[in-house]
Amino acid sequence: RLFDAVALRKELDFDLVTRQYVNEIPYFLQRSFTNWEVENKVEVVNGNYIRTIKVKTPVKELRQVEGGPYNEKIMNGIQFRTMEYLSKDQDDFEVFKKYCPRREKRDVDHILESGKIAKKEIGDLGISCPWAMGGVYNLASTYINVQDMMVDALSEEDYYEDYMNFFADLVASDHEIFVDSQFDCVGMQGNIANGGMMGPDYFEEYVLPYERKAIDVLRQGKKPIIYHNCGKARVLYPAYKKLGITVWETISEAPQGDNVLAEAKEYFKDDLILFGNFDQVHFLKEATPEEVEKRAYDLMMTGKKGGHYIFACSDYLEIGTPLENVKALLRGARAASRYE
């Protein structure tokens, strides 16, 4: 992602915010450690990639199975869906917590070296904002079924608190390394705990304290945070003010989200920076260049009032997006970018 983004920036001339993965798979599933033997296998079954991760401990074997669409040309960037979770019950989690290894020096060095490389490659073309280990709720839901998590918070309070604190500590320790890196800011995924999944009271009681624990590490280290929720978020606006984040992306409108840029601008004012809002799923891909240019101009005129806005699409470009539409997007945004 880093090198492709820099090359694209040089070709199309836009302000760059790179969103590369430093560790797409967490360190504890990349390789084996003492009492933690990892086997990672990817195979094609019935037209799908199936990724199976097995972890053998002295007590029992944990297993995670994920699937994604098969494409013989690509492997990176595939969105895998979990079919079997590493931690299926409280017994599994106790094993996970007991034997999950600590980082080694090589893991720390990898993050720090990645920051140096990003700094050198990007230069004055923009800033780097890699994905760290993830938002706490997102990370927990990678290894524990989110349906169980929703219920655990209400019916198994001690168990829920135990695993959320465990994952919060993992993310916080990850953030401590990023604070010492040359990356300009840090990305946190917060799209699982979205406004379509839960209400504001639930979020503030069962999600916010753990996210804030990890966010505070970055705040104390003066490292800006981009918090990602590309879905519904309107009911969570009050909670987002309490998160302590620097930037919230992506302000997605219907049908992907329920946000309206003008309303979000009015609500947040200068409490945080808004990032995104242009529909790349349908409009950028399907509209004419003229329509794209006008929409980009209009969105920029709305977003730039009072500052605290970064114009962008609401997520990555879809396969099949016409290059002429991307160029039209940039023309429209540039035409409205000046303050006069």
Show where each model-derived region lies:
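Active-site loop segments of alpha/beta catalytic cores
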Residues: R1, T82, S87-E340
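N-terminal basic, low-complexity leaders that serve as flexible interaction/assembly modules and, when applicable
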Residues: R1-V65, P69-K73, E113-I117, I122-I127, ...
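Short, conserved acidic/polar surface loops in the N-terminal third of protein domains
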Residues: Q64-G67, N76, L139-Y143
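Short, surface-exposed linear segments at secondary-structure transitions and domain or protein termini
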Residues: N71-E84
